[in-house]
């Protein structure tokens, strides 16, 4: 793994960094294919939304792009770039230094090749006990406080279960620990609205746009457990793993249906790779 801090090769930050002390910052995880950052504009748009939500200045786009290009020039053709922006700062207490100053932490790791069976046959998913509590001001963004997902993911260690679904306090399904959820039912594509909590993934937006272009009704709405169990098709997605059908949720089995397959073909695998895509 290659790691830069503020544009220089480094793998440590000061212990007083506010990202470490308070989770005061944002992050993005970007897929790199042959040196190109996929969906870069969408990641930047969410980063900007996060800055507004946290009442922070605009992100340092030019510096981030210079860091990105420098790391990608040294790294593998297919990689995952993680961008962390923290309010560096010093001193004590919750009050931010004025004006806030950014600390840029970027790491580049080789991309993993995910099993083709996950895309062709689907994955097993479970229900999590951990709830996702509402915080509308932070809904949709990728801030550095991710204890909800950490606690949810700690609920199982069975390698055969690929994801867990988290509900809110009202019982509505928010999404997975690392992915957005889609339900196909009665010819429509449904996904949680994420107005109160959750993360609005960059691939989520692409899936919704692709479905609309294919003439499929798309609705952001509250989804219950029963809505999921009575679905015709279920799938999850994120920017690094792509679209993965759900073949089993708890005791209920599903098949990867026509809508999921059409969206997989439209969106494509996470990146072109030998053995991927041909069977979709």
Predicted regions located by residue number:
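Helix-start/capping segments and mature chain N-termini
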Residues: 1-62, 66-70, 86, 92-280
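Ordered, amphipathic secondary-structure segments that act as subunit-interaction surfaces
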Residues: 74-85, 91-92
């Amino acid at each position: 793994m290659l790691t830069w801090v503020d544009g220089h090769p480094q793998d440590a930050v000061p212990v007083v960094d506010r990202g470490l002390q308070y989770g005061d910052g944002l992050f993005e995880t970007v897929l790199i294919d042959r040196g190109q950052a996929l969906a870069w504009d969408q990641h930047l748009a969410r980063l900007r939304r996060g800055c507004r939500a946290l009442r922070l200045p605009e992100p340092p786009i030019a510096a981030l792009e210079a860091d990105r290009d420098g790391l990608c020039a040294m790294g593998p053709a297919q990689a995952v770039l993680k961008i962390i922006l923290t309010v560096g700062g010093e001193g004590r207490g919750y009050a931010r230094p004025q004006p806030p100053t950014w600390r840029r932490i970027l790491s580049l790791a080789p991309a993993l090749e995910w099993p083709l069976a996950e895309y062709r046959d689907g994955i097993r998913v479970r229900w999590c006990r951990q709830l996702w509590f509402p915080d509308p001001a932070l809904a949709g963004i990728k801030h550095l406080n991710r204890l909800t997902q950490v606690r949810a993911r700690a609920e199982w260690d069975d390698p055969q279960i690929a994801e867990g679904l988290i509900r809110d306090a009202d019982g509505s399904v928010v999404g997975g620990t690392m992915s957005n959820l889609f339900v196909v039912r009665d010819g429509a594509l449904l996904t949680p609205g994420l107005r109160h909590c959750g993360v609005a993934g960059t691939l989520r937006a692409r899936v919704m746009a692709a479905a609309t272009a294919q003439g499929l009704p798309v609705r952001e709405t509250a989804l219950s457990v029963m809505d999921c169990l009575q679905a015709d098709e279920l799938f999850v997605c994120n920017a690094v793993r792509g679209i993965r059908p759900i073949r089993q949720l708890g005791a209920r089995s599903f098949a990867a249906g026509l809508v999921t397959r059409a969206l997989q073909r439209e969106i494509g695998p996470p990146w072109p790779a030998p053995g991927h895509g041909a069977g979709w």
